[in-house]
Amino acid sequence: MEQKSWRIEEIFPRFVNAQMAKGVSEKTVQTYHRHFRSLGYHLDMTMTFDELTKETLEAMLVSLRKSGVSPNTVSSYARVFRTFLKWCRAEGYTDLSLPNIQDKETVKGSYTDEELIALLRKPAKDCDFCEYRNWVIVNFLINSGCRAGTIRNIQNRDVSLSDKRVIYRHTKTGKLQSVPLCSQMAKILSEYMGIRGGAPEDYLFCTVYGEMMSENALSCAIKKYNHKRGVSRTSIHLFRHTFARKFLVDCGGDALILQKLLGHSTLAMTKH
């Protein structure tokens, strides 16, 4: 009996399920789906693995580069498809692989000192809760370099003011992470938590209704906050780059320590 040759689009959902079983984050799963859809413009996902060739994969990469996306985006798309092909090889669907594509070296931006002065200025005492909360969030992002998904998932019980530490329950690696708080940040959180109140399992940075902030709500909150302070750039991830720059350049910090603080699995990720 002739063995069936599966179509790429048929196998992709199986790959995603296998990755979910391994415990990859929901954001990673979303990236798989988003990149797979985008790659569909450059590779016929209805073709079978028997029809897929080295030349077809090379044509996909050429088409990607000609589409006008950045070199790093090409690398990101290729990285996802390479992971997919690696799983397919292990499952016996194909013998093909995709070569590793190096990102082009780029200088990561960060908030300027002038922008930081504007962003870190404490709001007036009669400001509303949202503005005050956003000021605390900005302070936390600059002092910790944590990801947006991480800060949204911090609960009141995760903050130990006595030990000056905070636990990250939601990380890209899926592992709990305990990071230190500087004295100034601990003081800011102490005041904020006294005003915020709530149960231990409540989210630290909540909406006015005490609920967890969505990804979009956090992004919009920071955008509104930054614009009100006269700062046009509103990227949350830019705070992460700013923290890294401050730690390494301004404070002469150790790259290996920075790797742990940022939750990177390799030092190469920290360098980028």
Regions found by a protein language model. Give the residues of each.
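Conserved catalytic core of the tyrosine transesterase superfamily
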Residues: 1-272
